[in-house]
Amino acid sequence: LASTVIGELSASLISTSSSRHSRVSSRSTSKTLSNSLTSAQITSVVDAATAAVAAASLNSSEDLIQIMPKIIEGSQGKLATVGLSNSSETIKVINVIGNSLVKSINGRSDKLPSASAESGSTATETVLKKITSTSVANLDEAGLSSTDIGNASSELVETVVGSLGSGGLSSTELGGALDKITAGAVESLDQITGFSVSSLGDAIDNITSGATAALGDITVTGYSADDLTTMVENVTSGATSALGNISMTGYSSDNLSSMVEKVTSGATSALGKIEMTGYDSTKL
């Protein structure tokens, strides 16, 4: 299973490289995916993913909830040394990796065992949370500096959310997934080396903004502009619930009210970025 998913990652990196690009969903306005990796660099990144899976003894695993974080750790960790020219090129690759893994859960519910689901979450919610949280936690391993974290985490969350239709989710699964994806991103910020509490508020603002803006990218039968109010509530509740799980020097309950404001301001600021038939930002 791991080798198949890594093969799909390789294909995704190739199909979005060398001036070609794709989108996170079938909507013509949705987020564009591209990267500047050479074929040799793609091989290095893919080989690192394979090595990480092997090191975790997951070569024969049939559990995507176990496998996918290792693929992210390996592939993202390689980006620091593969020779990318700047942080924006690195972030582009991280977006392709996130999109590829979300697409790889489509049609594989049998590889998402309920025994691996987190308490209070479905297996699908768990794997999406793990994709997001592992990617955010490994942004520094990808060679990004602390000043890039807000932008990178926003982009990654925007990609994962926009890709949910490509991941085969049904309209009834979207709300829970949004909650867990946003929570996973926010509560992983404390895993990033060199990232300080002074930058936390802006990053949380960026994450809820990215998740909210991507609501217009999701292509799922039965999902429409009528669902947006509920979806934005899921984004903000996920981010807010994660605030209590952050452990950082200088961060305490004293920070909570200002962080909740950042959750709200991020979501509110992105309402105008949502493009959907029948949507008018004044409605929310």
Model-derived features: positions:
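Non-catalytic all-alpha helical scaffold/repeat segments
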Residues: 1-284
